[in-house]
Regions:
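Subset of outer-membrane beta-barrel
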Residues: 20-288
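Bacterial N-terminal signal peptides
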Residues: 11-19
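Accessible peptide chain termini
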Residues: 1-2, 17
Length: 288
């Protein structure tokens, strides 16, 4: 039990702090998926928070993510038509509870207990103007580890424009904003500029959609490329994706099916970091 707790403690702290040192505080929590779409596409494209099958319909979503190292994430969101577009409000919470603080000497008695958590409150709006699909997302972030905390704002804006019947191209500016000082330094968010490409083909009842996003993250001296292919047949959707960064490659997949007013989604992600498999289960209720 002692060594299992120490393992979870190590994974949690490394996961939230050590990517780029303290300047990476917040970057990992922002990128932890809170929904199946985030595990499929990543978090660089704001448009993925506004799925097409919910345009014109209000919906309520609840999801649970078993992330690496028993880092548990819960997300609740509501989307609704507003001002000719679509509005979104979402809450995401993730963290560890009852972590044990220990010294370097092994012992059954911890020095103290504490928690590490992150809270992300996101609000956004999607609209279309002159064939340009635009999504804007603003996120308020609160992080706390032991007795230290940091809060800030993060924004995403994405635009996508058709260039012919099957292709769309656009760009996304992701995670720009600021964080309060954490301990003695001011953390930097993982700001990135990304190219977006989408190709869609339809054959009878089958629809195939290929999506690509790629960009550079200066604050982490890193890059991220994501490619996703999804096949839709009637009310069943299957997808497979690959996400590549400088140090880690992830593969993710999902299955989604719609039954009446209920949409059930399952997604998974695994990588060559050998931390296990992340799994997300999500229920979406389409409201009248």
């Amino acid at each position: 039990m002692v060594y299992k707790t120490q393992y979870h403690y190590t994974i949690g702290i490394i996961f939230m702090l050590c990517v780029g040192g303290l300047k990476g505080v917040g970057s990992q929590f922002l990128n932890v998926p809170g929904s199946v779409n985030e595990i499929k596409y990543g978090t660089q494209n704001a448009l993925i928070y506004f799925p097409e099958n919910r345009m014109g319909r209000s919906s309520l979503s609840v999801s649970h993510n078993d992330w690496y190292g028993d880092f548990s994430v819960i997300s609740v969101g509501i989307a609704s038509p507003i001002f000719g577009g679509q509005g979104l409000l979402r809450f995401k919470y993730g963290g560890f509870e009852n972590l044990e603080l220990r010294d370097e000497v092994p012992s059954d008695d911890p020095l103290s207990f504490y928690s590490a958590f992150g809270l992300d409150v996101a609000g956004g709006f999607q609209f279309q103007f002159n064939d340009i699909q635009t999504a804007v997302l603003l996120r308020m972030v609160q992080l706390r580890i032991h007795t230290h905390s940091s809060s800030g704002l993060s924004g995403n804006i994405s635009m996508l424009k058709p260039i012919n019947r099957d292709w769309k191209i656009g760009f996304s500016l992701a995670h720009f904003g600021f964080m309060d000082s954490y301990i003695n330094e001011e953390p930097a968010l993982p700001v990135s500029g990304n190219l977006l490409v989408e190709h869609r083909t339809v054959f009878q009842e089958l629809q195939n959609t290929f999506s690509f996003s790629g960009g550079f993250i200066p604050s982490l001296d890193n890059y991220i490329f994501s490619a996703n292919n999804a096949v839709l047949w009637r009310h069943l959707n299957l997808s497979l994706a690959s996400h590549i960064t400088k140090n880690v490659t992830h593969v993710s997949g999902s299955i989604s099916f719609l039954i009446g007013m209920y949409q059930v989604q399952y997604g998974f992600q695994l990588g060559d970091n050998q931390l296990g498999i992340s799994q997300v289960l999500e229920l979406i209720v389409l409201l009248p």
